[in-house]
Design a protein with these regions (language model features):
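Short beta-alpha junction loops
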Residues: 105-106, 146-148, 185, 208-219
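Hydrophobic alpha-helical transmembrane segments
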Residues: 26-27, 33-64
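Short, flexible/disordered intra-domain loops and linkers
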Residues: 109-122, 156-159, 217-225, 238-245
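Juxtamembrane interface helix immediately N-terminal to a transmembrane segment
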Residues: 9-31
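N-terminal topogenic membrane-targeting module
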Residues: 2-10, 69-157
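Donor nucleotide-activated moiety binding/catalytic core segment of transferases
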Residues: 158-179
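C-terminal interaction surface of TIR/SEFIR-family domains
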Residues: 222-326
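Amphipathic helical hotspot of TIR/SEFIR-family domains
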Residues: 185-214
Length: 326
């Protein structure tokens, strides 16, 4: 497929596994080295002078450590992006039809506040876990944001000229195993969904309605980290649930208003607890039943109010099985 693309592909930065590994390793070394130096200086000050001086040194260095930590984590994430597979490489090496992921560029930083995403050092985004759950169908690809230095993790990025993006989307829709959209209010995304409704077999179409974190959380590393922290994040997530539920419901109602006339059958009035909408062969929309994390995960995390938790692989199992059988 990659050898016969009818549009111009913008060359992406080549995948460099060794450089990416070194970059991530540098981030980890910086984290542990900085923490070790902090405590060594604290201990040396206590031994050489007094406990008070040691405490003052500890407090004085704390802002520098707190300020540098996000940069270390970003370095780890950058290394992972450098060694992430590129879409063209996957299309050349994997004979299966791809899964096309549609989303608004504004949702590229949409973090996943659920378990097990909270156990990761680098903040995990919805896209990464969604792509992981769909890779059994084929390579998951998406058009990349123009000008981004490295591709985001999740769907492998393909870059095209601004004048060609619609042709690229339609080309892959005609050859895809499935089309999955992270729904948001975006004119470009709505055009893509409209085209998908017209060109893609309805049973291959899947819509995901995420829980959007507040803008002030997405714009701050530490707020994102605390929201995803396995311990403290549990309480913050419960506090954030009403607002995130309201934003998710608003996305769905905007989608209903925009696409009611484009679908053969009416959409449900509300999502309820469902996160995904799929379609049957006749085009009838169906809410995928929400699944809870496994009992083992809930016991290990003491998480018994799993409102925001999306166990992607478990929840998407019916859709994946249906598409695989088509």
């Amino acid at each position: 497929m990659a050898n016969t693309l009818p549009f111009e592909v913008v060359p992406a930065r080549p995948r460099r596994p060794f450089v990416g590994w070194l970059t991530s390793a540098g981030g980890w070394l910086a984290v542990y080295g900085m923490a070790s130096l902090w405590f060594v200086l604290f201990g040396a000050a206590m031994e050489s002078y007094s406990e008070l001086i040691g405490l003052l040194v500890f407090v004085a260095l704390a802002p520098a450590v707190v300020g540098a930590f996000p940069w270390c984590i970003r370095l780890i994430a950058k290394g992972r992006r450098i060694r992430a597979p590129r879409a063209l490489d996957l299309l050349l090496s994997d004979p299966r039809p791809p899964v096309l992921l549609l989303r608004s560029f504004q949702d590229d930083d949409l973090i996943d506040p659920s378990f097990p995403a909270t156990s990761q050092t680098v903040p995990v985004r919805y896209e990464s876990r969604l792509a992981a759950a769909l890779r059994t169908l084929g390579p998951v690809i998406a058009l990349g944001r123009p000008g981004e230095p490295e591709p985001e993790l999740g769907a492998a990025r393909l870059y095209v000229e601004d004048a060609d993006w619609q042709d690229a989307v339609q080309y892959f829709m005609d050859r895809t195993a499935a089309v999955v959209a992270i729904v948001a209010e975006s004119q470009g995304l709505w055009w893509e969904i409209e085209v998908a409704i017209q060109r893609v077999r309805s049973e291959r179409l899947l819509l995901f309605f995420p829980f959007p974190a507040p803008a002030k959380v997405l714009g701050s590393f530490w707020r994102s980290a605390f929201l995803q922290d396995p311990l403290w994040g549990k309480w913050l997530r419960r506090k954030a649930v009403p607002g995130m539920e309201a934003d998710r419901g608003e996305r769905y109602q905007q989608f209903r208003a925009r696409f009611s006339d484009s679908l053969k059958y009416p959409l449900p009035e509300r999502l309820g607890r469902s996160r995904f909408v799929q379609f049957d062969r006749a085009g009838g929309p169906q809410l995928l039943p929400p699944r809870s994390p496994s009992l083992i995960v809930r016991l290990l995390t003491l998480n018994f109010r799993e409102t925001l938790d999306v166990p992607f692989s478990r929840e998407l199992r019916p859709f994946v099985a249906k598409v695989a059988a088509v």
